């Protein structure tokens, strides 16, 4: 049985098609603030895939999600938008107001939380998100600007310093302004993660585009890099979704 999984973010639309739990197709595209139009261009392709259901993670507002829903009706198969709950599949949400937790973070936690394990789950995307779990209890977390947001903020507020797209490649003191900026930003984020990891024993799991970079500097914590963590969380969500 084939399923379609959509991850609709603020700037990108990602999709996976799976069959018998195996990914058979995956793509990610910028949607230029118009995800519904991008999806409209993909509908004919999806229509010929023999899909049986659709699971969606979307950070969009209600109006945009309704447009997405209308377009997907053309496929004439069940569509489920994942939502954050106070409790779901045994997982307790750590936010006072669960709906304020990003659906991407919730699904990442749902993908890995288990009774006798504690996790530090880090999403290395547009923001650096950190979520902590103790068994099946989500403890809340942290949100920080990522490497590039921090660098861009510094460029905007620093006169006379032109900073090219250099690699965030090590934590040594910089011997020039470019290296000092890049190494300093990376050191700040790595130090934050290390501080959290030192507070109590927990497994470290990294996901998102910069996950391999952060893993390189966090080897003493034996990090796991999970590329499709949100997909796994979305699959978990649908597996526990009430049947009609």
Curated annotation (Swiss-Prot):
It catalyses: (R)-pantothenate + ATP = (R)-4'-phosphopantothenate + ADP + H(+). A monovalent cation. Ammonium or potassium. Its cofactor is NH4(+); K(+). ATP binds at residues 7-14, 126. This is Type III pantothenate kinase. The keyword Cytoplasm applies. Homodimer. Its main location: cytoplasm. Keywords: ATP-binding, Coenzyme A biosynthesis, Cytoplasm, Kinase, Nucleotide-binding, Potassium, Transferase. Its EC number is 2.7.1.33. One of its GO terms (biological process) is coenzyme A biosynthetic process. Transmembrane segments: none annotated. The active site is at 104 (proton acceptor). Substrate binds at residues 95, 102-105, 177. The keyword Phosphoprotein does not apply. Catalyzes the phosphorylation of pantothenate (Pan), the first step in CoA biosynthesis. It comes from the Bacteria. It comes from Acinetobacter baumannii (strain ATCC 17978 / DSM 105126 / CIP 53.77 / LMG 1025 / NCDC KC755 / 5377). GO terms for molecular function: ATP binding; pantothenate kinase activity. Pathway: Cofactor biosynthesis; coenzyme A biosynthesis; CoA from (R)-pantothenate: step 1/5. Belongs to the type III pantothenate kinase family. GO terms for cellular component: cytoplasm. It is found in: Cytoplasm.
